Swiss-Prot record:
Keywords, ordered alphabetically: Carbohydrate metabolism, Cell wall biogenesis/degradation, Glycoprotein, Glycosidase, Hydrolase, Polysaccharide degradation, Repeat, Secreted, Signal
Record's protein name: Probable endo-xylogalacturonan hydrolase A
Enzyme class: hydrolase
GO BP terms in the entry: cell wall organization; pectin catabolic process
Localization: Secreted
Family in the record: Belongs to the glycosyl hydrolase 28 family.
Residues linked to a glycan: 295, 382
Molecular-function annotations in GO: polygalacturonase activity
Superkingdom of the organism of origin: Eukaryota
GO cellular component, as recorded: extracellular region
Record has Mitochondrion as a keyword: no
The PbH1 repeat ranges on this chain: 177-207, 208-229, 231-251, 260-283, 293-314
Reported function: Pectinolytic enzyme involved in the degradation of xylogalacturonan (xga), a galacturonan backbone heavily substituted with xylose, and which is one important component of the hairy regions of pectin. Activity requires a galacturonic acid backbone substituted with xylose.
Amino acid sequence: MTFGKAAFLSFSLFGASWAGPSRTLQARAVCTPKAGGSSSIDDVPAIVKSISACGDGGTIVFPEDSTYYLNSVLDLAGCSGCELQVEGLLKFASDTDYWNGRTAMINVKNIDGLTIRSLTGSGVIDGNGQNAYDRFAEDSSYDRPTPLYITGGGDIKVSNFRLKNAPNVFVSVKGGTTNAVFSDMRLDATSKSENLPKNTDGFDIGESTYVTISGTTVSNNDDCVAFKPGCNYLTVTDITCTGSHGLSVGSLGKSSDDIVQNVRVEGATMISSTKAAGIKTYPSGGDHGLSTVTNVTWKDITIQNCDYAIQIQSCYGEDEEYCETNPGDAVFSGIAFEGFSGTTSSKYDPVTGNLNCGEDGKCDVSVVDYSVKAPSGGAAENLTVTTYKNRCLCQARSV
């Protein structure tokens, strides 16, 4: 009897002390940085303090109708698995002396699980680039920063806010970044002076894998999306680009061997751009390297007043005399321009596209379902491109 009681008591104590897993999820920590309320007060330290408190899986909120003045680089170090909820205005200082030579305005380095978004769509990040446009017009050596500079890390989501007046490239992704998604963004650069907002690429996608851009509009004065060396598995869908240099590979091969591969663009509207889609590679010789472009497709592209619908430049950055001696050796494999329609500008009328493959390279390029018109003529035939020595082998003409 004594043994039985002891056993029962032991079991009862064990049962009383054991607790099952909790069904209650812990709430994310939420921080709202205190804004200084004046452009003379740098709000970056307050934001960094909030990241320190809430950056590990929490949320940092910039409320609607609030203004934060960022007079120095905002480094998001420590923001792991966290969210920046931008409903108000983040405005960078226009001090060109401070920004000269600095790479990033918002620095995202080796961060995993970062989300930057606006729930309301009212959020704005203002690069305040007018002074940079004016200074660069006077001094082309002026070294301008990029508002959102991402190197390394992964599982990054950026969505549903406006990024305006970047001094330089709007968004840069490189350094082995993987799984980055940009959606429902609005990027625009406008100068109030005669000095254009030069080099304001919308997105520069360099060394990275599995980057997606969708539902986005870009109005700028350079590439809408540039596929830079090391770009691999990039998808761009439902994008509208105005005033740009196109959805472009390159430039590649300036001083090293460069590769871009596995890119798909589908569903783009290109308005008043120098070209809608294209490739830019340096020729052979000198310090130039080998350019390799593999498995890149542009599909269902609508042209509105673009100078060229499609363009391949295999003698980029050098003059014709140089390229006669050093014809292009770029390797193009599995390149497809599919389903292009619309009307070009009158700049090259009746020519609507210019495809130039170098003699010493490979030119596996196809153009199908091409119905782009020049202002003076009808639709062009489908085209297939092969190599020819440093000449425009194949021009898409209205017929």
